[in-house]
Amino acid sequence: MITNGRSISRRTFLKTTAGAAIGAALPSLFYNPAFGNTRRPVREFHFTAAKTSVNLGEGLDFVAWTYNGQVPGPEIRVKEGELIRVVLKNNLPDGTTIHWHGIPLQNAMDGVPAITQSAVSPGNTFIYEFEARPAGTFLYHSHAGYQLDQGLYGSLIIEPLKQEASYDREYTLVLEDWVMRDNGGTADTRRRPPQNMMHGRMGRRRSPGPSEGPLWEPIYDGYAVNGRVNAAIEPIIVRKNDKVKLRLINASSATIYFLRLAGHTL
């Protein structure tokens, strides 16, 4: 077992995680050298990466790679400045990591395999620990191979210590393009977007709609909002004059979305 890049014994690991419920966020208070010479509350989350049969609300079930058996993975919601501990157990057949997209971190916690850390091997455990800064809406995901496309992603919400504006309701919308086939499809159907369509690049694939230009491939089976497609997407319910905060996360491999709200101007 591994924590902070170092091997630890099973007994030590069990001592540090005893009483933690799988998938739950448990506040605790203890001394941890990784966080400095102080006692501060730590928000602890437990993730298991594993293959899971899923259905996005339409079509047949298929095998995705998930955190805690769900797509997207569990939302992590913390306050700015809180300390986060994520215990990742890898039950997948391949090595995996968690990258905290947009969060400035020391290399050991950044989750880029073969660059900032070794991938967590099948059957092993790794502990990520870092301070929740800055406030904002972020995406966490595997940075190994096509694992994000296979379902290993979720939202990280860091609430500011002081709200800049008031609102009545809040929704987080995670957008994803899906090849709804076991393990992301075969070698012939797996997502292989050109380099200029990858994360952080100016991809040309627009959804949903006709292909535009030479960069339209690959074709996806569905476009999901919070893990649901088409008619299965849950509507946003609001009252007249409500002030609504939308947190938008694009976890797609190669899709740009044009968003509309009926009767409203964006």
Question: What are these language model-derived features?
Answer:
Residues 27-31:
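C-terminal segment of classical bacterial N-terminal signal peptides
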Residues 1-8, 19:
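N-terminal secretory signal peptides
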